[in-house]
Amino acid sequence: LFIDRSGIPLAFCIHPGNTNEQTTLIPLEEQILRDFSLSKFIVCTDAGLSSERNRKFNNFGGRCFITTQSIKKLKKDLRQWCLEPTGWHLKDSLDTYDISRLEDTAKNRSRLFYKQLYVEGNDGKRDIDFDQTLIVTYSLKYRNYQQQIRNQQISRAMKAIDTEPKRIDKHSQNDYRRFIKKTSITADGECAANKIYEIDQDAVQEEAQYDGFYAVYTNLDDDPSEIAAVNQGRWEIEESFRIMKSEFEARPVYLKRDDRIKAHF
């Protein structure tokens, strides 16, 4: 779904549920270029659409991008730079901050700390520069929110260990059961007759280190805090999908032919 800055839908395309969404962005952009005769626009996407191929496509022809970047998937040196507690900034301030020393106060919870790193690159296919800025933000409010969600998931995981052991082994990437560790051997290395389930504290700590952090790649030269604010506006797309599923009752779809599925939406 493409929307403008006011949240008004511009274009919508439908794909089978098993389609890799990264491959859907460029064809839809090309359609918008034809239909709306747009010469310039800024594409703002979540991490699911943030492939290097898509970013390079939006690095020429008057197009720009702001795309979410998973910190976990960055190279080790960039990941360490993102999580480094020193060298953070605030909008309209010349000071630098150490986020490890922040007190959890109302004032600090309302602040958005950031830092940026210029990353040089090249688009060999088009023989042009592919330079990006990696912008990382840190928010105590976002950190507390992520901690709250994870604590709720850990509580569900503990309950599952006690009541639903047969369902523990099957889980998705963000499922609460990812925090459950299974042991099938004894301390002596022998096969155990029963599986032992417990909370995986290593997995909890690994995930907790990213609490409060958020990263984007962009080829814009604007103020980092302004770019972060634009990216946060993506919630309007999620809101549009919620409206379709609730008020518009767009799902479930009891149709099979592609033309009728499109007509339904």
Named regions from a protein language model:
Residues 1-265:
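Anion-binding and metal-coordination hotspots
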